[in-house]
Structure formats: C-alpha cells, structure tokens
Amino acid sequence: MKIAIFDSGIGGLSLLNEALKRFRGVEFIYFADNKNAPYGTKSKDEIIRLCLNCVQFLTNLSVDMIVIACNTATSAAITELRSSFSVPIIGMEPAVKLGVNAGGDILVVATPATISGNKLSDLIHKVNLESKTHLLALPKLVEFAQNMEFDSLEVLKYLKDEISKFDLSNISLLVLGCTHFNYFKDSFRAILPNKTGIIDGVNGTINQMIRRLGGVSEFGDKNSIRYISSTENLNVKKIEPYLKRLDIMREIN
C-alpha cells in the first residue's frame, strides 16, 4: 500500500505523524511544495494550478491514495483534483462539525484563502453554526512554521494581538484550520482560557482514509517514508525536529 501525503510545506507532517501511529505496512510518500509555499495568500486559480501539478507528479509514482494534508489546497482545488485524476483523493477541512455540541462560540483560525473560500462557509452552514462561529486569518503563522520559529516572543505577540480581537470568555472551542498551526498548540493554550478546547482535522482525515480503504489500516509489518520537496530532497534529519515537536503538541487539547 502506497499513500502520498501532500502539503504546501511542513504543515502536513502533523497528519503523517499521526498516520505513522495508526497505519502499519504502508509506504508513505510525503511531498512538500516548499518552492511555492505558502499557499494561503495565493489566488484560487494559482492554488489549483499548483495542486494539479503536484498531484500529477504523485500519480506518476503509482500511489494508491493521495491525501491533501492542507486545508487551503482542499478548499481551493479538491473538486478539480478529483475530476482530473482517478486515484482516490482525500481532502482535509477544519473540524467545525465537532463544534455542534460546544457550549459557547467557536473560533476558526486558518489561512486567508481558507477563510475566504466557499468550502468553509458551506461547511459552517451545513452544520448550522453561522451564529456562533468566528473566523480569523493568521497568514504569518505559516511563515513562522516554515522557518521553524515556534517559541519566539514575536510569535506569542502576534497570536495575542490577533486573538485578543475576540471576547475569549465566550469562546469554548478553537478550531485549527491549517495543519501548520498544529505546531503552535502550546502558544494557543497559553493564551486561551482553560475551558476553551483546541481541535484540528487530523484524526478526522485519518478516519476518512481508513474508511476509504475498507476499514483496513494494517498492510504489513513496518511503515516506510520517502520525503520529497519541490526545492530539494528532504532527509530524515531535517524532518525529525518537526516530528518531535508534533509529538508534544498532539497531547495538547
């Protein structure tokens, strides 16, 4: 079983990190389009063009499934991708539906492209949460992640300044609508009230992958990983610091 995971950069490693724990015997290919990151500030047409090129590259590797581990790419291009390729393509979207039972309001943080896209507004409408959902674009956070700047005072100030625009006493759930944002769960946790939960779309996406594979998640004894970047070949030593941080962040909710 060969599964490709695609993101504009290192955000999708949060999905790969969890997939390595949930699957066995899978040959994973992680493709990062670092050359064109970030996607979140680009036009929809540009994102579609980039995604079509990347998915074409991955289909040439004879993969059995492609996972778009990028909310921005899913929002802008998933329809075009599925109509252009026969390989199963799993998208990723903000876990807004988990806010149905939230006692207070919901704050969704994502890239500008995801926030302004029809897919998110349609999703919020579908679960009837328009009246209690607030949206906040955090474009700088993707750049911080790509530069491995996770714990600086500049990051914390940026998040405090942006999130303080809302009455946090009313927010019962923060939805991370960008996989890059998973690297900053500790900073979000430090800013938000203890009662405010933090969720992302990783587990929901992996559950969808397993459903698409007929409920099967074990295909052999060991997983393998091949890292590919549009700028250079990635090696494990470059990836390990990200995965170690994600192991810590996954415990924060």
From Swiss-Prot:
* Keyword Cell wall biogenesis/degradation carried by entry: yes
Any matching Pfam family: Asp_Glu_race
Q: In which pathway does it act?
A: Cell wall biogenesis; peptidoglycan biosynthesis
EC class (word): isomerase
Reported EC number(s) for this entry are 5.1.1.3
**Keywords in UniProt for this one?**
Cell shape, Cell wall biogenesis/degradation, Isomerase, Peptidoglycan synthesis
GO MF annotations for this entry?
Answer: glutamate racemase activity
Q: Which reaction does it catalyse?
A: L-glutamate = D-glutamate
What InterPro entries does its record include? Asp/Glu/hydantoin_racemase, Asp/Glu_race, Asp/Glu_racemase_AS_1, Glu_race
- Gene Ontology biological process terms, A to Z: cell wall organization; peptidoglycan biosynthetic process; regulation of cell shape
Highest taxon above the source species:
Bacteria
- State the coiled-coil residue ranges: none
Chain positions recorded as substrate binding sites: D7, S8, Y39, G40, N71, T72, T179, H180
Catalytic site residues? C70 (proton donor/acceptor), C178 (proton donor/acceptor)
Q: Tell me, what does this protein do in biology?
A: Provides the (R)-glutamate required for cell wall biosynthesis.
- Say which family it is in: Belongs to the aspartate/glutamate racemases family.
NCBIfam families, per this entry?
Answer: glut_race
What is the name attached to this protein's record? Glutamate racemase
- Its source organism is Campylobacter fetus subsp. fetus (strain 82-40)
Lineage, top ranks = Bacteria, Pseudomonadati, Campylobacterota, Epsilonproteobacteria, Campylobacterales
Underlying gene: murI
